[in-house]
Design a protein with these regions (language model features):
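Conserved PLP-enzyme active-site core in the AAT-like
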Residues: 7-10, 14-48, 52, 56-67, ...
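PLP-dependent enzyme catalytic core of the Aspartate aminotransferase-like
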Residues: 9-11, 322, 398-468
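A short, surface-exposed helix-loop junction/capping segment
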Residues: 71-78, 362
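Short amphipathic alpha-helical segments
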Residues: 276, 356, 413-417
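Short beta-strand-to-loop capping motifs
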Residues: 282-283, 360-362, 419-421
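Short, conserved charged micro-motifs
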Residues: 288-289, 367-375, 422-431
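Conserved small-domain helix->loop->beta segment predominantly found in fold-type I
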Residues: 303-381, 385-411, 446-457
Length: 468
């Protein structure tokens, strides 16, 4: 591994890394006032998911499905073949995914959670265990819906926001081996690794950790799958931070990552650079047939999987563009740029910055708000009220639990500032910094929330709050 001081994204003799694209189509932003936004918050019951897009100046809730597509992707969409069976678009899509992953079976889905549902419904059941570095929300929910248990085994540094470990997304190999060793035959149907680790700050997984995880799984006869939503960002982190990879291309590194595993789930709405789509890839023919049977039942025929032909062609093109190194250099530097400025203001953030978002440690910032009063939700609300910026809560609302009316807090309360790909410029980010600085000065005046309504599963999408 290289030292942190060499992680800089330099570009020749100039320090400024420009957006490696020109803007061809624009969408107007409607300006709003703080008074309007306070009314919007009340109407939305302080849930960021309930705010309408027309009331948002800059939308940093998620990087999923919010990318701007390229002219080449739009051109590819015109080739879209919408044949119900045997679509030409599918075979172009399949060829692109196989070239990247090397998997024998590629099954399109309308997005990543559909791939998760099909996979886990096929192979998981009551009493089984699925380990991961950290399961994201839909992954955990789809596993638990089968009666299985989702177990998080990220290394200790992954739960320490200020730790500068270069690969905080790594799975704890000792804990993984202990789990596999103690499990009954068939109790662990598969092992997952999320690259990058979204719930832990968008932190990467090293190639060595991927390699050793695969070796452990083979030793115990357990299939090894990736949650590959942000595979390209992970590959570029490996290039920057892991010894022996500096002179390898991001594309070659990504191919090596996939070939260490037996399969993956993928939301193409992230590193596929599209607005909808995903896939399930694997080498096991029996599992693939089970998955296709479920696909036909709920998604569609195996050569379209709930997607139009144009979407399949856009994904095929996006998977090539996302591995262009000028783009990846700009992408990671954009996140680092925001992180540096928030850090300078005084915000406690997850260090080092991840690949798709900056994560503020709201629990550390708002010490006067206890975890059961949702400090991350408080910060999200303040950032929207004062600047019209929508961010995401990755904390107690998303990962905490309510057991018989008592809140069981999550490990961390983070505010995720996720940057959509190729959608905003540096001026937008500079505005975000100004708003964040204003809110920072008001931090001691922020209040907590109590829950007034919630769902039993994935409650953060529909939860309703009131101030306390």
């Amino acid at each position: 591994m290289t030292s942190a001081t060499t992680w800089r994204y330099t570009s020749g003799m100039f320090k400024t890394i420009i957006e490696p694209f020109k803007i061809k189509v624009v969408e107007p932003i409607r300006m709003t006032t703080p008074e309007e936004r306070r009314a919007v918050l009340q109407q939305a019951h302080y849930n960021m998911f309930n705010i309408r897009a027309k009331d948002i100046l800059i939308d940093l809730l998620t990087d999923s499905g919010t990318s701007a597509m390229s002219s080449e992707q739009w051109a590819a969409m015109m080739r879209g073949d919408n044949a119900y069976a045997g679509s030409n678009s599918f075979y172009r899509f399949e060829a692109a995914v196989k070239d990247l992953t090397g998997y024998a079976h590629i099954i399109p889905t309308h997005q990543g959670r559909a791939a998760e549902r099909i996979l886990f419904s096929s192979v998981c059941g009551k009493g089984q265990i699925v380990p991961n570095n950290t399961h994201f929300d839909t992954t955990r929910a789809n596993i638990e819906a089968t009666g299985a248990e989702a177990v998080d085994l990220v290394i200790p540094e992954g739960k320490q926001p200020q730790s500068r470990h270069p690969f905080k997304g790594n799975i704890d190999l000792n804990k993984l081996e202990a789990l596999l060793k103690d499990a009954k035959p068939g109790q662990v149907p598969l092992c997952m690794l999320t690259v990058t680790n979204n719930s832990g700050g968008g932190q990467p997984v090293s190639m060595e950790n991927l390699r050793q995880t695969g070796a452990l799984c083979r030793r115990y006869g357990v299939p090894f799958f990736l949650d590959a939503c942000r595979f390209a960002e992970n590959a570029y982190f490996i290039k920057l931070r892991e010894s022996g990879y500096q002179n390898k291309s991001a594309a070659d590194i990504a191919r090596e990552m996939f070939r260490l595993s037996d399969g993956c789930t993928m939301s193409a709405k992230k590193d596929g650079l599209v607005n909808i789509g995903g896939f399930l890839g694997m080498n096991n023919a029996d599992w693939a047939q089970q998955a296709r049977n479920l696909l036909v039942l709920t998604e569609g025929f195996p050569t379209y999987g709930g997607l139009a032909g144009r979407d399949l062609d856009a994904i095929a093109q996006g998977l090539q563009e996302v591995l262009e190194e000028d783009y990846l250099k700009y992408r990671l530097r954009s996140v680092e740029y925001l992180a540096e400025r928030l850090d300078k203001i005084g915000y406690p953030i997850v260090q080092p910055p991840g690949g798709h978002a900056v994560y503020i440690d709201a629990r550390a910032l708002l010490l006067h708000i206890p975890p059961v009063r949702f400090p991350a939700q408080s910060l999200c609300s303040a950032i929207y009220e004062h600047g019209g910026i929508r961010t995401g809560e990755i904390g107690n609302a998303m990962f905490g639990r309510n057991v018989e009316g008592k809140e069981i807090p999550s490990d961390m309360d983070l505010v995720r500032i996720a940057i959509p790909r190729r959608a905003y410029t540096q001026s937008h980010i500079d505005y975000v910094v100004e708003v964040a600085e204003h809110v920072y000065k008001l931090r001691e005046t922020l209040h907590g929330f109590r829950v007034i309504r919630q769902s039993p599963v994935l409650r953060h999408f529909t939860i309703e709050f009131e101030p306390v």
